């Protein structure tokens, strides 16, 4: 049988598998093409959370972890598990980079600032790591330790911060160290889409003590709830003393430890602190936006001055070349899927819109920034809207057009595309919008799959984790905006020789089995470190 060309991996981001129900937007959506392929083509489900992707048991999956496992071809030991294991083993408390930050403030009699996403969400950060840093500060008898909490409400319930605050206040009371200085919704502190006006508001609270004011973190959160503002969108708020002064701000000579272990939403705020060329970078970004006819914010934020003698530690590497210290440096996947394809002399094409572009490039390629030889990439800009329920189709039509052009060019042996809609719209909690998001993906695939088949190619359609299939929280009955532990779909669409009569996809698989499956379709041998197994079982 002739090798199929192109082999296309289609990732329906956040489209998990769950029983039908009023909160299963993926099932409620009118998706005749996806429904037919799931019913009539070789189909299975894949483990996409917990131990299946190198996370703690029961931990929800996410896009970074998912794409890393998909590309690696083996279960990748995730940073959450890696850091938590270091805490359990005691290695965390002798980490040389963390100790360097401790020594920095001791020598200068300055302050240590701990900032990051707050709570047990486990996608970007985990409260256990913050608690361990407080324990470290306690062991070294630090007095001036300030916390800057970025409220979640997305990977956890929308209004869950007060419960996490109870836990944190208990830890602070037990250890006798730590004072909360600011709180901010992740919408501001963790923007990743170059909306610098949001980052600027978070930075102003952290460094200048400018923003909303509240006498305590609890008061700040309760005031936001009273205005019907959930955790994710809490305005950057400065906790003030009885005299109205900021409890603490980040100053020259201080040390900062950014507790996020996932890179993508930590980069922008980190740049605000450490990038010497920040203002020029921001200016050029908005000049490009203006030239492209895109709307500009009412005011363009610029950093007034860069802090001096600042020891800035990130828990993991957020980006190559950032002038920071890294507590847990990367351990690269050396031979990911893209490398094997490149080494075979084949051409490949990676495409997604902005929100998922790092996932089909950096994460899929094992943490490598640069493309491999023979690898082309295309970034489709995500729409500039406040939240994606306002435009649930996002940029799926534009992704589809560019993908069709790549298929029609007949240049590529392998193509990977990510449709961001089910996940990004899923995070808004709006069931009608998520239904439209899933329908937008179905409409795109209705055009893409026939083009693949016409050229003698095959499509392997998967998800990287669940989200859209569970929009109602089973405990509260309210909106569920987080990822899930549900399995991901996996189905193979091809011509003669690839139907149910010739092939089945084995059960019990996980995301790490996707790369070996694709390499079998490409008639290539997996790299020696790929311990995943092809899902394809050929019938006799």
UniProtKB/Swiss-Prot annotation:
Keywords: Glycolysis, Isomerase, Manganese, Metal-binding
Pathway noted in the entry: Carbohydrate degradation; glycolysis; pyruvate from D-glyceraldehyde 3-phosphate: step 3/5
Required co-factors: Mn(2+)
Gene3D superfamilies to which the protein is assigned, alphabetical: Alkaline Phosphatase, subunit A, BPG-independent phosphoglycerate mutase, domain B
An annotated GO cellular component: cytosol
The keyword Manganese appears for this protein: yes
Protein residues bound to substrate: 124, 154-155, 186, 192, 262-265, 356
GO terms assigned for molecular function: manganese ion binding; phosphoglycerate mutase activity
Organism superkingdom: Bacteria
Cofactor binding annotation: Binds 2 manganese ions per subunit.
Record: residues binding Mn(2+) 1: 423, 427, 483
Active site (catalytic residues): 63
KW Repeat (keyword) present: no
Any coiled-coil regions, as ranges: none
Chain sites annotated for binding Mn(2+) 2: 13, 63, 464-465
Catalytic activity: (2R)-2-phosphoglycerate = (2R)-3-phosphoglycerate
One Pfam family in the UniProt entry: Metalloenzyme
EC number(s) stated in the UniProt entry for this protein: 5.4.2.12
InterPro entries per UniProt: Alkaline_phosphatase_core_sf, BPG-indep_PGM_N, Metalloenzyme, PGAM_B_sf, Pgm_bpd_ind
Protein function: Catalyzes the interconversion of 2-phosphoglycerate and 3-phosphoglycerate.
NCBIfam families linked to this entry: pgm_bpd_ind
UniProt family annotation: Belongs to the BPG-independent phosphoglycerate mutase family.
Quaternary structure (record): Monomer.
The protein's name in its UniProt record: 2,3-bisphosphoglycerate-independent phosphoglycerate mutase
Source organism of this protein record: Chloroflexus aurantiacus (strain ATCC 29366 / DSM 635 / J-10-fl)
Lineage: Bacteria, Bacillati, Chloroflexota, Chloroflexia, Chloroflexales
